[in-house]
Curated annotation (Swiss-Prot):
Belongs to the archaeal NMN adenylyltransferase family. This is Nicotinamide-nucleotide adenylyltransferase. It catalyses: beta-nicotinamide D-ribonucleotide + ATP + H(+) = diphosphate + NAD(+). The keyword Protein biosynthesis does not apply. It comes from the Archaea. SUPFAM superfamilies: Nucleotidylyl transferase. GO terms for cellular component: cytoplasm. Pfam families: CTP_transf_like. Pathway: Cofactor biosynthesis; NAD(+) biosynthesis; NAD(+) from nicotinamide D-ribonucleotide: step 1/1. GO terms for molecular function: ATP binding; nicotinamide-nucleotide adenylyltransferase activity. Its EC number is 2.7.7.1. It comes from Methanococcus aeolicus (strain ATCC BAA-1280 / DSM 17508 / OCM 812 / Nankai-3). Keywords: ATP-binding, Cytoplasm, NAD, Nucleotide-binding, Nucleotidyltransferase, Pyridine nucleotide biosynthesis, Transferase. CDD domains: NMNAT_Archaea.
Amino acid sequence: MRALIIGRWQPFHNGHLSIIKEISNEVDEIIIGIGSAQKSHSLDNPFTAGERIMMIIKSLKKYNFPYYVIPIKDIEFNAVWVSYVEALTPPFDIVYSGNALVKELFEEKGYEVRKPKLYNRTEYSGTEIRKRIINNEDWKHLIPNGVINVIDEIDGENRIKRLNMKDYDIIE
């Protein structure tokens, strides 16, 4: 059985990792959709699809389960969105999502939708992690080492801080 899970993964964090590991115990393969793949360089979506793909692959490399990582752009047309996702991904049998609209759309097309267990939502949240980066608070313990490596490689900390500025300044 093959499962689909779609997220923005901005960034991929330990809560996401726990969900993926849990799903891997229930299915044979996982399709990890990079939602809003066209978005980057904004405070809500600071990382490119390619950077998010690197984060996920580097975070999952030590685990032994098959998965695919597929970028999925927004199309702003809910009535055909499931067909659009189906055209971009390998076939799948089940969808994991906590999003009510995603659940509604996939169930209308006959898919079983399961709600993944959420882990420590207060800390394991992309919004919280980005906020901590901006405020120079501890955040690295909330994400896998592979994600830390990617953020370091692309100077992602400073990118997020620059995106938070109203005017351009030099970050020391």
